[in-house]
Structures are given as structure tokens and as C-alpha cells.
Amino acid sequence: MSYLNLRLYQRNTQCLHIRKHRLAGFFVRLVVACAFAAQAPLSSADLYFNPRFLADDPQAVADLSRFENGQELPPGTYRVDIYLNNGYMATRDVTFNTGDSEQGIVPCLTRAQLASMGLNTASVAGMNLLADDACVPLTTMVQDATAHLDVGQQRLNLTIPQAFMSNRARGYIPPELWDPGINAGLLNYNFSGNSVQNRIGGNSHYAYLNLQSGLNIGAWRLRDNTTWSYNSSDRSSGSKNKWQHINTWLERDIIPLRSRLTLGDGYTQGDIFDGINFRGAQLASDDNMLPDSQRGFAPVIHGIARGTAQVTIKQNGYDIYNSTVPPGPFTINDIYAAGNSGDLQVTIKEADGSTQIFTVPYSSVPLLQREGHTRYSITAGEYRSGNAQQEKTRFFQSTLLHGLPAGWTIYGGTQLADRYRAFNFGIGKNMGALGALSVDMTQANSTLPDDSQHDGQSVRFLYNKSLNESGTNIQLVGYRYSTSGYFNFADTTYSRMNGYNIETQDGVIQVKPKFTDYYNLAYNKRGKLQLTVTQQLGRTSTLYLSGSHQTYWGTSNVDEQFQAGLNTAFEDINWTLSYSLTKNAWQKGRDQMLALNVNIPFSHWLRSDSKSQWRHASASYSMSHDLNGRMTNLAGVYGTLLEDNNLSYSVQTGYAGGGDGNSGSTGYATLNYRGGYGNANIGYSHSDDIKQLYYGVSGGVLAHANGVTLGQPLNDTVVLVKAPGAKDAKVENQTGVRTDWRGYAVLPYATEYRENRVALDTNTLADNVDLDNAVANVVPTRGAIVRAEFKARVGIKLLMTLTHNNKPLPFGAMVTSESSQSSGIVADNGQVYLSGMPLAGKVQVKWGEEENAHCVANYQLPPESQQQLLTQLSAECR
């Protein structure tokens, strides 16, 4: 244990408080404080520690002269968190040297290190004349600069006047501190399945597996996404077993350009042109590298299920999401999209086989850029789609957006292919109190599969406005109008004008196109209006509205989607009223759903200091009505269990009836577990005619230089916790995440290019484990697997009473273990606390600079000491 870490534990403990690994030399701080107080009137003179304040015999006190210079620590190298002007900079080993009588010890920081933290070295006279590896005398060279080491927090606080700092944005973290992570392989798996027993329609089985694998080498990230699906039913002979490869790509960041290079399968940004999947190469700006103060969307999907239903989401022809949801309103906000744009097709398949299908627009908000900021993308490759009727057309695309003074932004782009050419130009304006508006036009020349040539234009308006005084947030109002000759690039990749086929005894024949086709180039898009608004009502209520209206050339049929909801709370009682409407151009009639949800936590009836497990439970009621006469009512209870609240449950029962379906009782029960090695869920639902069992497991596997670590599903950027010896330690602020039997864990997500705090809960450490530092800070790059290391000392906690020449060792003497690197300070009566000690060994003691001011003590402990919380021992130091 380093001296610095010992002082940390001294500051956070009381006397002989031994709850969780900390016995402190509390008397050191107490008596030293008294010494300071006694000398306060002599503030104009040098501080002096009179040993007689500590003991009558001056020989019973170690040499404390270093405290006279304000040194809580001797000179040396210590790992500290560096903060500059209250902003975190880095965690690193810093060498501290002896300063003058007022400074105590001072940090040794080089010119390059200070420059990386934002110091404008050219503005400091004489600094650029120093050698590259020289220690900069910061407090003397920079006027009004300070450097203070907070021993208890292991934190080096630097302050430098703004006049000497480079002009950097708030929240700026120097790229030198970005961590590309370790070399490692990863695998994400998500398996789900269900079995349905239908008294009328027979039995059916469905399974789905999503595998996301990857390899990190240096700054390069290799990723692959593959899915497998299986279904069988009594209605059809045999079963369908299908593997589908989604994409594979290699990428890395280009830090000087604040950009990202992608090779392989990727997607274009949907800010100017419609987003498309490609196979090729792309170099594009990555605004995540900018600080939050310089940064300007996957959509949240709302829906309502009549019963326990399977929700599938497609984007650009690929299945990107699959889940089973209970009856009533649901929200999906964790989509792993195959691209950053492209409308999402949501299918809700009920247990009786009926389906709802609607489209969620996926596009960006107005394209304003900060003054002087440029965002670009350059893409070359071939078009990719999950639709076999689309060809792999080669293309080139470039886009550029640039911020001008006075809130103006200009932008544009081009798409070029053999049968398609498009050019876009637009302008945006921040209109202050009136909101933000952008307008652009695209001119396109297209050749369709029938070799017909078309010229057309498409004009788009986007508007965004927040009315803070009224609580209204108009998140997006968009309108696009296209002439009859306008087609987008994807339209020209089809091999035929329409793709509707039916299977007959004579084989495949071409029939008259209908709107059951997913595409028909005879009916190209005309006008589209979309709106998203949220309104705050008072302090506890929110109203949201979202919808879209799409018209086509050549037909009066339209696509319509509308959703509305009211969320409110009365004390701790929450209720939600929601409505949805979906009408597809190819579908007769429309789907509508009205739902009400009420949730009352059991804590509403419990005392605030109740320890009952029911304080984590709630009662619920839900009602849904499809406005065609069918209604479902459910009541039940849901909540969490276990110490970490990582087992959630829900039990609902009720009645469904009316409309076209049968009437009778209905209900469901689910269990969801989030553990250190992955997640699992199981559920069961029933009605009079249908019974359904659904289940799933998901998790992540990380293969690294120190072995294989299992965890919860991994996001793009993750943290590997390395604390060998600290098994089963909980990671703070994470549900179900604990270190494994070796002391490793995976924090399944982290924010790239931002400071991430990783901490272990010391209350969950074993009794024979101590941590030098329970907190680590990391700044990962995108896609990185960064390591947060914690040094765990495993061994016996020992309260040793040391004597020398039949007298207690001097107060304040330094004690160091030769084998465990543990150290401590002698308190009263020769007592010292040491942790992580072996059964047998020796300790070295030093209490001055004289030749006879040191000794060595050997000790031997009985085996049962390994099971004791604290072992006490007396030894003679010779």
C-alpha cells in the first residue's frame, strides 16, 4: 500500500473503525492538527512540530520534519487524478519533488503535459526555452497559478488563469487522453423464441438469434452482424430455417480530421439524401469527437399490442429488432439500427396471427451547424439491400455542411451512378425566438428499369422550435414535395418496375401491381408531412403527438400514421392514456387502438422507512380498445427482487372480449434476470384459445489478453474492469454487474470521447481484500474496449504492536512490508495497521535519517488468521 493510499484511508476512517478493510492512523491527523493549532499565533515564523506535544520523551516520536514544510507525503511517484480549473484531465503517475518551505512537495509536469491540458505555453515567458523533459515550475512561471495535492482524494488540483489557457470549448478533452483501448475480440448474442398453442390454428414455433461479433486491434474495429431465424407451424409442412448476413465492416477514427473511415458495409448519413446501405468505403465527420458544447437520433417507437405479441422492426430490408411484448402500450428505445437512416417498418404480430404494420420515419432535424464548423462525408461503393430485386449499383456520394455567421448554414451534395444523377443545395437559418428552419432542393435525373428517363425535383422543409415558456417542444415539422419525375437513387436500383409475384400451378407469373407490393415505381412518392410535438402540462404531465402523411403520384391512396399520448402523475401514482392510428396505402381500412395504463407503487401504502421487499413492487391496471368493439382489461403486479434488484417480474390477469375475437380470461407472467454473465427472460401468456411460452437469453463475450470474460450485452464501446483478486465485487451504478471469480467484469457501455467514471463498491469486497483505489476514469474512443485497472491486495489484515529495545516504536514511524508492499504509520503505543499481509514475513521500520533509526521485525501468524477479520500481533523490531 503506498503512502498516498494510506493517507486516503486515514482521511475516510474513524479511530479503529474496521468495517470494510479500513483501520486508520486517525491519531496522526488529530495530533498533527493540534500541533498546527498550537503554532497558529506564530504564523509569521516557520512551523515547528514540538515532539513534546506528542510524548514526553522526544525519542518516542519519529522525525516529523517533513510536516513542517506542509508535506503530508514524502517525495515520490504517486497515481493521482489531475484536475485543471475543476475539470478532469487525466489519471496518471506523477512524480512529486521537494518544494520550498511553503509549497511542500510539488508535481513534476513537463511542458508537453501542460500543453495537452490546455496551457498556451507560448503565452508564458521562458517556458518554451525549457527542455522537453524538464519539470515546469508552474507556480513561479505562471502568475497566480496553483498546484495542490489533495491526499485524501488522490487528486492533484491545478489552477491556471484563463489568460494563459488556449481557447478551448467547455468540456474539451485533449485527444492525447483518448484511449483506443486494448486488443480484444467480442461477441454479442441475443436469442429469443416462443411456442404458441392455438386451439383453432394449431401449434407454431419461432426462434431468432442475433450475433454481433468483432475484433479490436489498435485503433481498428472489425464488426459483423448476422441473424438466424426458425419457424414452423402445423399449418405448413416442414420448417423454415434461415441465416441472414446483415453487414461486415472495418473502421477506425481519423483523429486529426475528427472523422471516421469505414471500409466494407456501411450506411450513408440521411441528412441531405435518403440514407442507403453500401459496400465500399466512406470517410465522414464524426461529431462525437467534439465536446458537448460544440455539438448540435435513433427514433423511439411507441405502439399498442392487443395481446402478448411479437414485434419485428425492419430497416432497409433487414430485420434489426425482434422482441415479445405484453398486452397494451409499449415503447422501444434500444434499437440497434442497420443504418443511421431509412424508415423503420414495425410489424406487431399477435398470437392469433393478426398483424399491424406501420412505418416510423427516421430522419434528422434541421441541418444547422455552428459558425465555422464543417461536416462532410465522401462515399464510394455499391448499393446494398436485403431485397433480392434490387441490384448492386455502383455509386458515388458526397455531402458538405458549413456554418456561417449570423446563424446561417449552407449545405449540399451529389449522388452519381450510371443511371442516376442528383444534386442538392440547401440553406438553414437559426431564427432565434422563431425557431430553426432549413430548406433544400434536389434535382435528379433517373433512368428506371424500363429504360424510361425522368427529370424531377424534390423540395424539403424542416422546422424545429422549443417554446420554453409554454413547455412546448416542436421536435420536428417536415414537409417534402416531389414532382412526378422525381425518383431517389434506391428507385433506380430495382431490376423491374414492380415486384409483385404470385405462385400458381403454372409457376411464377406477373400480375397487375397492387398496393400489397412493397414497391411500385408507377406510384412514386409525392408529398410527405411529418410532425413530432411534446407539450409539458404543469409539473407532472406531458402530452406527445407524432404523425406522418404520405401521398403518391398516380393514386389517391395514402399512408397515414398518428400517435398521441398523455403521461401524468399524481404524487407517486402514474397513468398514461395513448392512442394510435395506422393506415397503409395498400390496406383497406385502418388500425386504431386506445389504451389506458395506471401504476401505483406499493410504497404508496408503506412507511418511508419500510424495509419490506414490497417497496420495490407496484400494482398496475391496463385497458386497450381497438375501436372495433374488442377490449382487453388487465390488472396485476410487477416489481424487482434480489439485493441488486436485478430480477424483475410481472404478473397480469384479466378479460378480453368483443369484436371479431373470442371472449374469455387472459393473462401473462414474465421473469427477467440481469446478471454478471448475461441476461435471461421467460414468460407465459394465455387466453381461452391461445397459450404462448416465450423465452430468451442475451449477453456478451469478451476475449482479451487476460482470458475470457462474460457479461451483459455489449454496446459499441465498453470497459473491461481488471481487479485480480477482487472477486464478486459490485460495479457501482450498474445493475447485476459484478466481477467474476478472477476479478474481471465488463461494463457493457461507455460514452466515447467523454470521461467515464468506473468504481467498485468496496462494501462488496471480501474481508481479506483491499483496494488501493476504488475509482478509475477512462476516456475511450468509439468502439474501444478500454481497461479500468484496480490493484487489489489480498491477504491478512494485521494490527501489529511493535517494540524496539523493549519500548514502543516512535509515533509516526514508517512501516513497510517487504512481501506485500503494504505500508503504514505507527500510532500510539507502537501500533500499526497493515493489510494484504502473508502468514509469515518481515516488516521494515524507519523513524529518522540517522543510522540507528531503523529496524526489522519478523512475524509468523497461525493459519486461522486467514479467516479472521482482523488479526492482532506483537513483535520485537531488531
Swiss-Prot record:
Note the SS bond partners. C855-C877
Q: How does it sit in the membrane?
A: Multi-pass membrane protein
Q: State its location(s).
A: Cell outer membrane
> Which GO BP annotation is one of this protein's?
pilus assembly
One GO cellular component term noted in the UniProt record for this chain: cell outer membrane
Domain of life the protein comes from:
Bacteria
One of this protein's Pfam families, by short name? PapC_N
Q: InterPro entries, alphabetically?
A: Fimb_usher, Fimbrial_membr_usher_CS, FimD_plug_dom, PapC-like_C, PapC-like_C_sf, PapC_N, PapC_N_sf
Signal peptide limits: 1-45
| Major localization class | membrane
Q: Which UniProt keywords apply?
A: Cell outer membrane, Disulfide bond, Fimbrium biogenesis, Membrane, Signal, Transmembrane, Transmembrane beta strand, Transport
Molecular function via GO: fimbrial usher porin activity
Alphabetized NCBIfam families for the sequence: PRK15193.1, PRK15198.1
Q: What family, per the record?
A: Belongs to the fimbrial export usher family.
Instruction: Please describe what this protein does.
Output: Involved in the export and assembly of FimA fimbrial subunits across the outer membrane.
What is the protein's given name? Outer membrane usher protein FimD
Q: Which organism is it from?
A: Escherichia coli (strain K12)
Q: What is the lineage of its organism?
A: Bacteria, Pseudomonadati, Pseudomonadota, Gammaproteobacteria, Enterobacterales
